[in-house]
């Protein structure tokens, strides 16, 4: 029996017409070659929400998605479940809210979140193996394909090998699989200097920055499948203003000074016998 996994795709003002157009979500779900329990689209920060809802209803009637969620309406319950307030989200609210809503709505089952601009290079079911491994070892929190922008990156950043997966630190919200029950919890108040490497980090604490900090503080790891790669076609942070010059200089200085530290809590041994290094570099994590 397949695990209960829901696919969530978020859309913004810039792309909701494309995401909800005929064929898009069918193709998005099909590339994973997995029988999702639900295919869900979240509607986020859209100027004409009535128009977006109408398109989502049409997509549901076509059978391309099972559900759509308006992020603004679902956010209060998600914030409560995750121990956050609207004020906590700050300037990067829309780099946080959709993910909180997704994990809250998918819990207590598995969530595959995939950015609308992410596609696998080759259709492949990497989910079945990943679900089994995530369920078998609580030290493994998330799983993802390897990233095509740096084909050797997952191996280079790994600290162990587990079958077809590289095991390492780091997190990206571009495409990830997780037990949503573990993420729909008050785990998002951690801070870690390694978060400076993330886009938008000077504007605030995004979802991926917060979850990465939680993982580092608790010695939690991710699986990157060596058999499958994804491509992200978008421009990170396109909807947010550029930082003032002095803040960009400050950010550059922090990176030069080597603020990308690894957690001291990852010196453990996997069940397969591979030792986890405690000084693994976080630089370049996708």
Regions of interest found by a model, annotated:
Residues 103, 121-200, 213:
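Conserved catalytic core of nucleotide-sugar-dependent glycosyltransferases
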Residues 22-37, 58-61:
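Short, acidic, metal-binding catalytic loop of nucleotide-sugar glycosyltransferases
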Residues 44-107:
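Active-site-proximal specificity loops/subdomain of glycosyltransferases
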Residues 15-18, 46-55, 151-154:
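Short, charged/polar "capping" segments at the starts of alpha-helices
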Residues 108-119:
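Short beta-strand-to-loop acidic/aromatic patch adjacent to the donor-nucleotide binding site
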Residues 1-29, 41:
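N-proximal low-complexity "stem/linker" segments adjacent to membrane-targeting elements
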Residues 39-44, 72-73, 145-148, 221-233:
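Acidic carboxylate-rich catalytic motifs and surrounding loops in phosphoryl-/glycosyl-chemistry enzymes
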Residues 175, 180-181, 187-286:
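C-terminal catalytic/acceptor-binding lobe
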């Amino acid at each position: 029996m397949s695990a209960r996994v829901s696919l969530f795709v978020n859309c913004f003002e810039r792309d909701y017409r494309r995401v909800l157009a005929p064929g898009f979500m069918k193709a998005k779900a099909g590339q994973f070659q997995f029988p999702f329990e639900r295919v869900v689209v979240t509607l986020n920060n859209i100027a004409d929400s009535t128009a977006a809802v109408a398109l989502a209803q049409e997509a549901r009637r076509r059978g391309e998605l099972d559900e759509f969620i308006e992020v603004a309406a679902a956010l209060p319950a998600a914030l409560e479940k995750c121990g956050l307030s609207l004020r906590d989200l700050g300037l990067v609210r829309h780099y946080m809210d959709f993910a909180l809503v997704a994990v809250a709505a998918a819990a207590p089952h598995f969530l595959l979140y995939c950015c609308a601009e992410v596609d696998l290079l080759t259709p492949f079911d990497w989910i079945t193996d990943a679900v089994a491994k995530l369920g078998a070892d609580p030290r493994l929190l998330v799983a993802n394909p390897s990233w095509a922008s740096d084909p050797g990156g997952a191996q280079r950043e790994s600290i162990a090998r587990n079958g077809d997966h590289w095991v390492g630190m780091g997190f990206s919200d571009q495409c990830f699989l997780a037990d949503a029950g573990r993420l729909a919890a008050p785990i998002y108040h951690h801070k870690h200097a390694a978060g400076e490497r993330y886009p938008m980090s000077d504007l605030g604490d995004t979802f991926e920055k917060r979850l990465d900090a939680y993982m580092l503080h608790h010695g939690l790891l991710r699986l990157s499948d060596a058999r499958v790669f994804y491509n992200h076609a978008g421009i990170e942070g396109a909807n947010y203003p550029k930082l003032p010059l002095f803040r960009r200089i400050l950010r550059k200085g922090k990176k030069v000074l080597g603020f990308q530290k690894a957690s001291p809590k990852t010196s453990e041994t996997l069940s397969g016998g591979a030792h986890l290094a405690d000084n693994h570099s976080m630089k370049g994590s996708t």
